């Protein structure tokens, strides 16, 4: 029973304990308060804060999720959730959570500060991880050979290690899906083997024993099934024998595509022996071939309804549900077909039906998306989004652009507009995905290149920004946005290369870039960088070689190489 007054009293006691650092007592008071008012989102937020202060981050995360589920538009809930994920070192998840909160309140200082902090930690952690990983690969001949075979090997290995760090409890599941070379790299990175209970030989023996047991069980099931079938044949009535004769004739007609004749034989079989569910199953198949889908549905439903009178087996009923699903698919009644497949799986959970269900769900989603397309309505939502954008209401602008894209997913301008809204919301990676999609749809769309350049500039990827602006200028040499962006970026690179200060954030980001790592790990470039360090004026020697000059430009733009 809800008692808000008691909940409020307990909350105040919990707050007092929290302020005094008595977090265990605070947890008790907040938990008791929730018992009295289980729909008060603030209580779950306070409980999450108390758990986090005790270092009990899993419980803090659970409470924060409950808070958000009750009140999705309350920014503090996202602060609590992000804090718990931060404590669990789920930095990428924390970043996403803070971004979710900023969608609701873009100017929330606490969310902005938390996002900045977690991003910096994430970049630093990645940089340290990459440096350690590269050192292991370079000093291990086997791993180094894998890198030579596949230049993407370090990146794949890094992603696997990050997955393990985020979900240590799932390490065996993660490794079971990896290529053996990746698993080897993971083991060398962590310094021990993940072999399960016992050694590899014992594990193989255990698997062999299990396989042998499965084989024997399957053989026993098949033997029993044959015995049951034989018993059935010996106990068959004259009606069953006569009914099967008509069924076999119907099957022959069916193979010859003589469906009228086949239908007649199956109906004869049913008339003689109405309790054999498979006669109805065959009859439904004929109706489907004759495109009499209503009759096929009627036949299947009748047989399923009388399954107990027919003493039908589970697998037989599952087959009827599958046939019912096919009938509904042909009638474009996808929801009913999906329901039929799901009921089939209850009777007999097999791979073929699971695959058919997944394929149907994909088909339904695809057709619904296609049916939803309406360029006129897309234009309406785009215009609404533009109005919101002009009024600096960027979350609602994004929502309108989302709907416009659903209505017309092949319009490059819509992705560009949404990228602009996402940029204002500081969701640079998502905005970059949108401009890349816009360019994919229209490679001549200059505005998309200028926005791509701006995003790389904001993300301090100055060389990539220059490339984007340059591509836009190739398409339109007089484009004002690309010209100004290029000049701004070139000035920033020049200023940065001559400055004594180092932009730590940009430096960490650059060192985590696989392209930069490849350049600085190249032996030839290491010699060049050493010479430039001794004599900066020697850079003129390398400008003539396009490959070397291109690499040097990238290092300068990345803030790694200074030119004074």
Swiss-Prot record:
Residues 197-239 form a coiled coil. Residues 201-233 have a biased composition (Basic and acidic residues). GO terms for cellular component: cytosol; protein folding chaperone complex. Pfam families: STI1-HOP_DP, TPR_1, TPR_11, TPR_16, TPR_2, TPR_8. The keyword Cytoplasm applies. PROSITE patterns: TPR, TPR_REGION. Residues 513-552 form the STI1 domain. Induction: By heat stress (at protein level). It is found in: Cytoplasm. SMART domains: STI1, TPR. Keywords: Chaperone, Coiled coil, Cytoplasm, Repeat, TPR repeat. Residues 199-247 are annotated as: Disordered. TPR repeats lie at residues 7-40, 42-74, 76-108, 243-276, 278-310, 318-351, 378-411, 413-445, 446-479. GO terms for molecular function: Hsp70 protein binding; Hsp90 protein binding. Monomer. Homodimer. Forms a complex composed of HOP and chaperones HSP70 and HSP90; the interaction is stronger in the absence of ATP. Interacts (via TPR 1, 2, 3, 7, 8 and 9 repeats) with HSP70 (via C-terminus); the interaction is direct and is stronger in the absence of ATP. Interacts (via TPR 4, 5 and 6 repeats) with HSP90 (via C-terminus); the interaction is direct. The TPR repeats form 3 domains; the TPR 1 domain is composed of TPR 1, 2 and 3 repeats, the TPR2A domain of TPR 4, 5 and 6 repeats and TPR2B domain of TPR 7, 8 and 9 repeats. This is Hsp70-Hsp90 organising protein. The gene is HOP.
């Amino acid at each position: 029973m809800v008692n808000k007054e008691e909940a409020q009293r307990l909350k105040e006691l919990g707050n007092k304990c929290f302020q005094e650092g008595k977090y265990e007592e605070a947890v008790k008071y907040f938990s008791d308060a929730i018992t009295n008012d289980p729909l008060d989102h603030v209580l779950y937020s306070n409980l999450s804060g108390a758990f986090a202060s005790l270092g009990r981050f899993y419980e803090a995360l659970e409470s924060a999720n409950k808070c958000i589920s009750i009140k999705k538009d309350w920014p503090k809930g996202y602060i609590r959730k992000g804090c718990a994920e931060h404590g669990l070192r789920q930095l990428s998840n924390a970043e996403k959570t803070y971004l979710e909160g900023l969608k609701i309140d873009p100017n929330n200082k606490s969310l902005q500060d938390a996002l900045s902090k977690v991003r910096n930690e994430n970049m630093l952690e990645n940089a340290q991880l990459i440096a350690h990983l590269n050192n292991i690969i370079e000093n291990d001949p086997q791993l180094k050979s894998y890198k030579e075979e596949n230049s993407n090997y370090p990146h794949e290995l890094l992603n696997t290690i990050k997955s393990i760090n985020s979900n240590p409890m799932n390490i065996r599941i993660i490794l079971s899906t990896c290529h053996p070379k990746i698993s080897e790299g993971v083991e060398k990175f962590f310094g021990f083997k993940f072999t399960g209970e016992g050694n590899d030989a014992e594990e193989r023996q255990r698997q062999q024993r299990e396989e042998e047991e499965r084989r024997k069980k399957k053989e026993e099931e098949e033997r029993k099934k044959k015995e049951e079938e034989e018993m059935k044949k010996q106990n068959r009535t004259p009606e069953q024998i006569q009914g099967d004769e008509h069924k076999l004739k119907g099957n022959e007609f069916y193979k010859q595509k003589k469906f009228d004749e086949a239908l007649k034989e199956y109906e004869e079989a049913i008339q003689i022996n109405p309790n054999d569910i498979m006669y109805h199953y065959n009859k439904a198949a004929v109706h489907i071939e004759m495109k009499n889908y209503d009759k096929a549905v009627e036949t299947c439903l009748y047989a399923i309804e009388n399954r107990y009178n027919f003493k039908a087996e589970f697998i037989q009923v599952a087959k009827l549900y599958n046939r019912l699903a096919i009938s509904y698919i042909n009638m474009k009644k996808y929801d009913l077909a999906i329901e039929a497949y799901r009921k089939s799986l209850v009777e007999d959970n097999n791979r073929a039906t699971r695959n058919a269900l997944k394929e149907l769900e994909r088909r339904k989603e695809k057709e619904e998306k296609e049916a939803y397309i309406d360029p006129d309505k897309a234009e309406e939502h785009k215009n609404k989004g533009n109005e919101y954008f002009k009024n600096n209401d960027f979350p609602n602008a994004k929502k309108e652009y989302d709907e416009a894209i659903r209505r017309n997913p092949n319009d490059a301008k819509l992705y560009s507009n949404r990228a602009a809204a996402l940029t204002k919301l500081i969701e640079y990676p998502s905005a970059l995905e949108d401009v890349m999609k816009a360019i994919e749809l229209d490679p001549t769309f200059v505005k998309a290149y200028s926005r791509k350049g701006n995003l790389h500039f904001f993300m301090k990827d100055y060389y990539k920004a220059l490339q984007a602006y340059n591509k836009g200028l190739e398409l339109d040499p007089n484009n004002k946005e690309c010209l100004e962006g290029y000049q701004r970026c070139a000035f920033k690179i020049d200023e940065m290369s001559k400055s004594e200060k180092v932009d730590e954030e940009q430096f960490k980001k650059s060192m985590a870039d696989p392209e930069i790592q490849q350049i600085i790990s190249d032996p030839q470039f290491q010699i060049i960088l050493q010479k430039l360090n001794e004599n900066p004026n020697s850079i003129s020697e390398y400008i003539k070689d396009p490959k070397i000059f291109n690499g040097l430009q990238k290092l300068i733009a990345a803030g790694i190489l200074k030119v004074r």
